[in-house]
Amino acid sequence: MNIRALLLSASRVGDTPYLEHTLPFIAPLTEHARNWVFIPYAGISLGYDVYLEKVREGLRNLNINISGIHEHADPRQAIRDADGIFVGGGNTFHLLHELYRYDLLFVIREQVEAGKPYVGWSAGSNIAGLSIRTTNDMPIIEPPSFTALGLLPFQLNPHYTDYQAPGHNGETRAQRLLEFTMVDPLTPVVGIQEGSALYRQGDKLTLLGDKEAYFFKGSVQKSPIAAGADLSELL
């Protein structure tokens, strides 16, 4: 498979402008891909048209054309016709629900496996894993299944952080992922911090950015992964 998938933890890092830190990661994928389709289904409160314009503005320096999948009469054909696919962040459950609703999971996976570049951030990265069972957001809608694209043979946890507000008594992210690995000890999870990304090119997987990621599987909990590490053994 000639997969080229860039899975960004977030659309921002710190107080930087929207998508600014992602440009060096995305730019190489646009050299031979000028016409992109954007999937805004995770952006509920923002609205699809507003979300599309926000992405166009954030990526304006890349000299590419971006259409919204919601603008096309045939969403599946829009995926086939595009040179590349963007999938934005927001609510992961709603995103996956709509992908099932419009029967898009298979065609996206088919096109990406054939070499079409895929760029997701936040929820758009979540769905690149085996399922959305390690997402952070609220299940506001029930998709037919939690099974996702499977561009990576493990689970993702974008926006990974260990921060806990003083006086807050809820679970930490590590505790939530521990619970997942207790229920499913055979499936790995990689938590990626804001500002970092995973990039798969064929049989090679790399952690991009200057921050550690964290690996969880069975009894292995929060094992650090060095920035820039080769993670190809996970494929």
From Swiss-Prot:
Location of the active site: 122 (charge relay system), 137 (charge relay system), 159 (charge relay system)
GO molecular function annotation: dipeptidase activity; serine-type peptidase activity
Compartments it resides in: Cytoplasm
EC numbers for this chain: 3.4.13.21
One cellular-component annotation, GO: cytoplasm
InterPro entries xrefs: Class_I_gatase-like (IPR029062), Peptidase_S51 (IPR005320), Peptidase_S51_dipeptidase-E (IPR023172)
Highest rank taxon of the organism: Bacteria
Primary location: cytoplasm
Keywords: Cytoplasm, Dipeptidase, Hydrolase, Protease, Serine protease
Reactions accelerated catalytically: Dipeptidase E catalyzes the hydrolysis of dipeptides Asp-|-Xaa. It does not act on peptides with N-terminal Glu, Asn or Gln, nor does it cleave isoaspartyl peptides
BP GO terms, sorted: proteolysis
Family according to the record: Belongs to the peptidase S51 family.
Protein name per the record: Peptidase E
Organism, as annotated: Shewanella amazonensis (strain ATCC BAA-1098 / SB2B)
Source organism phylogeny: Bacteria, Pseudomonadati, Pseudomonadota, Gammaproteobacteria, Alteromonadales
Name of the gene this protein is made from: pepE
